[in-house]
Amino acid sequence: MAVSPDDPLILVGRVAGGFGVRGEVRITTYTEDPLSIAGFKALKRQDGSPALTIASARKTKDGVVCRCPGVETKEAADALRGLRLYVPRSALPEPDDDEFYLTDLVGLTVRHIQTDQLLGRVKSVQNFGAGDILEITPDLGGPTWYLPFTRAAVPEVRVSEGLILADPPALVGDHEGPEEKGLDENEELGDRD
């Protein structure tokens, strides 16, 4: 099933495995309210094909536990572990004027807040465990780089204008950035003060 570029799919959760012996499915949700995933009912795979239909859901300390037609055993639920769950962008409620979805940041132009220098475009939003970061593709080529998605580094987001104003931390190697502190050639990691 083709995914429409006008209505892209948005990742809202991931199957964590089975729960109990009756085929209930544990889902880690990426929604503000974990139970809101049950409101979508039919969840899709990344290619747009059907993934799961939620008949009922309840919140647990680790996410949401759902009953899904066609998943009747713990083994069947465990076999779904890792399955990413998507919904069309149009299924999400519209954010308030001063709010946005992280997916709305992809493709926005990034400019330096003080110099107006073009820094690049947002390629993706990542989270490796320490908070959201923006992967930036420089417009003039070169390797992508990461920008912490914090108020200090990203003081302004103007989704309607397609713009992010950023104040990136100094990069290692910049003359104004932090000094690089390497090891002496005879020093071992454990010997540093």
From Swiss-Prot:
Domain PRC barrel: 97-172
Gene Ontology molecular function: any one: ribosome binding
Disordered: annotated span: 168-193
GO BP term (any one): rRNA processing
Principal location: cytoplasm
InterPro entries the UniProt entry points to: PRC-brl_dom (IPR027275), PRC_barrel-like_sf (IPR011033), RimM (IPR011961), RimM_N (IPR002676), RimM_N_sf (IPR036976), Transl_B-barrel_sf (IPR009000)
Compositional bias ranges of the Basic and acidic residues kind: 173-193
Cellular component terms per the entry's GO annotation: cytoplasm; ribosome
Listed SUPFAM superfamilies: PRC-barrel domain, Translation proteins
Gene3D superfamilies cross-referenced by the UniProt entry: PRC-barrel domain, RimM
Localization, UniProt: Cytoplasm
Keywords, alphabetical: Chaperone, Cytoplasm, Ribosome biogenesis, rRNA processing
Physiological role: An accessory protein needed during the final step in the assembly of 30S ribosomal subunit, possibly for assembly of the head region. Essential for efficient processing of 16S rRNA. May be needed both before and after RbfA during the maturation of 16S rRNA. It has affinity for free ribosomal 30S subunits but not for 70S ribosomes.
Family: Belongs to the RimM family.
Recorded domain comment: The PRC barrel domain binds ribosomal protein uS19.
Entry-linked HAMAP family: Ribosome_mat_RimM
Subunit annotation: Binds ribosomal protein uS19.
Protein's UniProt name: Ribosome maturation factor RimM
UniProt organism field: Caulobacter vibrioides (strain ATCC 19089 / CIP 103742 / CB 15)
